[in-house]
Amino acid sequence: MNIEGDDEEFYNFNDIKKKRKFTKEDAIYGVFNDGWGDYEDEEESKMTEEEYYKMKKRYSTPVGFVASGIYEPNEHKLKNKDGENIDNDDDDGEEKKKKKKEKKEKKQKKKEKKEKKEKKNKKKNKYGGGGGNNYDDSDNDKSIEDKPVGGIGAALLSKMGYKGTGGLGRDGGGMVEPIKVQVRPKNAGLASVTELNVNSSDDSDDSDQSEGDTDSDNENKRSLGWKKKEPKLKYDFDEHLESTTTTTFKKKTTTTTATTTTSSTPQIVIDMRGPEARLYTGMEEIKHHKHHHHHQHNKEYQNITSILDDQSKPLSELKHNVDLLLKLKQIDIQNQDNKIKHENDKINNLTRGVEKLKLTIENDKEQIKKVTEILETITTVKKQLDQSQLDLKQLYKVFKKLKSNYPKEYQNFKLYNLQKELLEPLLKEKLNQWELESNSDNNDNSSLEISKKLSKEMVKWRQLFQESVSVLGEYQINVYFLIMRDLFLPKFKNYLRSQWDVKKPSNAATLISTWSDTLPDVIQEALLEQSILPKLKVAIEKWDPRTDPIPLDHWLLPWIPLLGSELESFYPLIRQKIISALQDWHPSDKSAIKILTPWKNIFQSNSMDSLLNRAIIPKLSKSIKDLEINPSNQKSPIEIQWLLRWSNLNNNDNNNNNNNNNNNDNNNNNNSITTTDNINLDSGLITLSTIICILEKDFFTRWLKILLEWLKSPDANLEEISNWYSGWKKQFPKEIISNDKIKSIFNISLNLMKKVLSNETIQKDDEILISQKINSLLNTNINNNNNNNNNINNSYQQQNQQQPIKPISSPSLNSSNNNNIDNISTKQMVEQLAIKNGLLFIPSEKKTNSGQQIYIFDKIPIIIERDLIMYNNNNNNRWEPANIQYLLDKSLNK
């Protein structure tokens, strides 16, 4: 194994080597750079690592530049140590040998450096040396001048063939000296540059020498990093005039030859006579110029202009100074003007601010005055309340005054919230004095009067608090709604659930009807659905028409204007109970008419017809069939009166004649239904067409047969027959006699009687005609009755299919335990309703800001607060009150 090679690899892996900077030459040439990879080796060969880092520190110190023109950076490449030029045509073999020697030397140096670094690392590990380069200054012996000087510019020039001396280009015949840049004084014109450009054609040698001299003189100054300020020269105008006058005469003699040579070149003339300086190429242009401005000048000004014309550089510095002074004065004037404007603007702004402050002070005074007045009124009202001298009317006037006189303060300070301190104590006193359980049968109208007065007063408060909203947690609730919820709703619920009797609806119905305009819709619906409907459901299920002394219509129909469609779900149960009660009913009993007449306009026509067809019409037709028709001993036909009183065709005379018989029949009937006597017996429940059909089928067919047999008998007495005929005809009202079928029957009987009077025999044709008539009546009646019955039954079935029983909005209606209806809570009612309809009802993990529990009713978040249900409306993100039916419809219609 090569231990040295392994050590080198381990050393290279652990060594954190400092890389050289990535130069612009590397970016341009990349790997193809000639010096790429060798630069670092050359650096390492020339200096150690400590020297390298120490030299790096010197870059923060001021730099001493080398004078240009003396140092040639690439001169060491072109000369040997003895000063002889290197031949470019040496052999390649010698160069290869030199390179091999250099590589060997480099490898040895690298090994020595690695050994030194290993020793240093061991020392650091022993003594726990930290970061930082602690080098000695003894190694820094070499000067910076030994380094090759030159940046990327020199490298690029060398690539393009520049060798350090001579001109640019491959052959050295290019440009040697670039264009010189000469400094022009600040704010000086072009005329001042002409003298600087006189010596522009001097040789480059002189310039190089001068530059070398200046550079050599200023080396020490530049190394120090600062320059001394040159002394400022003061300009004397008188001395300048004297010097210019003496020098002009000298120049005229010396420059005559020069003017002849330079006559072809244009002479620049500056005309300063006008308000603005003008440039001309010569005096001729001034003479022939069209626009001359003649001005009268003083002698001093004329002398100055003559001097300026003679001189090539006429007082440019003085001119410049005067212009500067003018500009400075203009700037001072503008600054002063701006300051004056700024101060004026400040004054205006301050005056406006003072006015605004005065207005705010006045407004604050007015507000303070209003607030003090409001406080005085509130304190006086509180004193009156404490002394029990305050009434609802007086308090209403105070609130109305506050709202009308101080509308902004009423809304900003939320003065309507004073109802908790002022209004609620008065309302509690009124509610304690109000006894809802007082019965109207005892002639005690005090509670009714109190309720009416209180409802009228609360209507006023409702209008006053219509736009007043109180914030409770996350949602906003109307103030009037809070009053009714907290004070009146518990009072009404307690009365309706515990004290109110269902079969005495006058108190509760009048209570809710009088308070319908006062109570909010949500509270009214909550009372009807949660307190009234459950008790009505229980009472309807317990109601028996045969034993209950109070009819159902007396205590159920008063709720129709308030409940409306909610009672429709009870109608099928009511019809079934009536049909079951009428199974043992006899047509002589009037109670059936009194029971069914109030439901005539409430039940639908199809359902009412089906009830009559199932319970009433068959028994009436049977009673007509059982009617005895005996000419020898004819009794009064009471059965026909039983039939006719189901319509509005009953004759009052017949009713009066048969009252005694009806009473006797009712007394003999054990299964009579008890009713009140306030309903008219001419109910009109059965139509005229059905009554005529019953008479044709069950009465007139038998009546014609008996009349025909009586006329055939030899002992027939025509007077008795005519009296018998007229007696039967009087039993029917005009509406029945005027019917075509009934007319034809009476006409046939008259024809037969006429034949007997004329001593004509009744032939077989007459008998056949009567039998055909009877058969046709029987057939038509049977068909009509069957069609009628089928239509009624079909309509009844369709009604039951089209109108399914709606789920009652109150869960207690669907619950089996109806006896505990007063003790059931709203939460239990909602839970039972959800179970009945297969909906989800669970408590949520979330709660409101006030700590109320949120429940999920089929994906609808609800809150149950004091027997009120509130749901979260997604449209406005508020908690709004809702009834159970609304939640059911919303969840089932999804």
From Swiss-Prot:
Record's compositionally biased regions (Basic and acidic residues): 73-84
Organism from which the protein derives: Dictyostelium discoideum
Composition bias type Basic residues, residue spans: 97-126
Source species taxonomy: Eukaryota, Amoebozoa, Evosea, Eumycetozoa, Dictyostelia
Keyword hit for Nucleus: yes
Record PROSITE patterns: G_PATCH
Pfam families, per database record: G-patch, GCFC, TIP_N
Family membership noted in the UniProt record: Belongs to the TFP11/STIP family.
Name by which UniProt lists this protein: Septin and tuftelin-interacting protein 1 homolog
Coiled-coil residues: 329-449
Record text on subunit structure and interactions: Identified in the spliceosome C complex.
InterPro entries to which the protein is assigned, alphabetical: G_patch_dom, GCFC_dom, STIP/TFIP11_N, TFP11/STIP/Ntr1
UniProt biased composition (Acidic residues): 202-217
